[in-house]
UniProtKB/Swiss-Prot annotation:
InterPro entries: Ribosomal_bL20 (IPR005813), RIBOSOMAL_L20_CS (IPR049946), Ribosomal_protein_bL20_C (IPR035566). One of its GO terms (molecular function) is structural constituent of ribosome. Binds directly to 23S ribosomal RNA and is necessary for the in vitro assembly process of the 50S ribosomal subunit. It is not involved in the protein synthesizing functions of that subunit. The gene is rplT. PANTHER family: 39S RIBOSOMAL PROTEIN L20. GO terms for biological process: ribosomal large subunit assembly; translation. This is Large ribosomal subunit protein bL20. GO terms for cellular component: ribonucleoprotein complex; ribosome. It comes from Clostridium botulinum (strain ATCC 19397 / Type A). Pfam families: Ribosomal_L20. Keywords: Ribonucleoprotein, Ribosomal protein, RNA-binding, rRNA-binding. Belongs to the bacterial ribosomal protein bL20 family.
Amino acid sequence: MARVKRAMNARKRHKKVLKLAKGYYGGKSKLFKTANESVIRALRNAYVGRKLKKRDYRKLWIARINAATRMNGLSYSKFMNGIKNAGIDINRKMLSEIAINDPKAFAELVDVAKKQLNA
């Protein structure tokens, strides 16, 4: 069986990992093994972070909507139920923006939800 020399492939792989580890402290930016571990961990954390960011923003929007609806005398869950029954299809991101930037329009939405709940 012929001998396999991996010089160029290994060099390319090492350079790629060390390039990703640029800016890390100490051996994590200089030594391949520790740099590789750090890069793998960093990429995994970045992936998880992108998923968590979506959850965090949704939580933030819900908290903002809840605060605004309680100022208008309704709870978040009742408001969402009333608005859904009224056939108003606005996502939570837009509702939170309306609650912050246009309180009068949001108060009208709360009134629509209240009427729908009473009907």
